């Protein structure tokens, strides 16, 4: 059963400006420790795109839950990792998921400078 759909678009140059001002403080604000490990392994020119995609993905996922970032869920509650084929996989912290019925999240990410987009679908694992 469909719980919700969310999407978000981010201008990569906007993230570049934020990185120039705040450097890695911004990354530490929106990335989980697992994502930060990935981030630090990237070449510096790829930092803005990585952050833009994670920002868009987390916004899209929060919108699919119907709450938005800061309204019961925050950036640190959502981790975006990639499987062996590069597919984005979403993990939501147990602090948040304990309040919900079992669910599965589908996420699609795409970027074509200067834009990146995320599209998320949340569905319940329960049959009605």
UniProtKB/Swiss-Prot annotation:
It comes from the Bacteria. Its cofactor is Mg(2+). Its EC number is 2.7.8.7. Keywords: Cytoplasm, Fatty acid biosynthesis, Fatty acid metabolism, Lipid biosynthesis, Lipid metabolism, Magnesium, Metal-binding, Transferase. It is found in: Cytoplasm. Its main location: cytoplasm. It catalyses: apo-[ACP] + CoA = holo-[ACP] + adenosine 3',5'-bisphosphate + H(+). Mg(2+) binds at residues 8, 59. One of its GO terms (cellular component) is cytoplasm. This is Holo-[acyl-carrier-protein] synthase.
